[in-house]
Amino acid sequence: AGELAVADTGAANDIYDKMIAQKANFPEGLKWTNDNYYGWKGGIYSGGFGCAAFAFAVSDAASGDARATIHHDYNNIRVGDILRVENDTHSVIVLEVKQDSVIVAEGNYNSSIHWGRELQKADLADNGSYIMTRY
C-alpha cells in the first residue's frame, strides 16, 4: 500500500505543477465571466462557460485527455479534482487538500480568475454538489 501512496503523491505533485503553470495563461485577476467558453476533453460535458470553462481548461492542461468520472466521496478529494459547489452553481479546481479544507483556483469569481481561496470541506457537500475526478 505504501508504494501506491507514493505513486499517488507523485501524480498529485505533477498535476499540481501543471495547474500552477497555467497562472501564466490565467493570471490572478484576469477578467473571466460567463462569456468565456472552453471545450473539455474530460468527457462528462462537452464544455462549459465561466467557472466551468476555467476549471475545464486547467484540468485539461494537467490531465490531457484522461476521462473524468463523477463521485460524491468528500473524504476522497484529490489535487486536480473539479468540485461543483454552491448547489450546482459554481465550479472550482483543487490545488491542495488539507485535513478540513481545500485550496482552489476558480474562474468567474467576482468576474475574474482567482487562485488560492480556501473552502471548508464541511461546506462543500450539498444536494447539488459533486466531484469530477480524472484519476
Where are these regions (language model features)?
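Active-site signature of cysteine proteases
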Residues: 99-135
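...with weaker cross-activation on analogous glycine-rich loops/strands in unrelated enzymes
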Residues: 56, 60-114
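Residues within well-formed alpha-helices
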Residues: 54, 91, 126-128
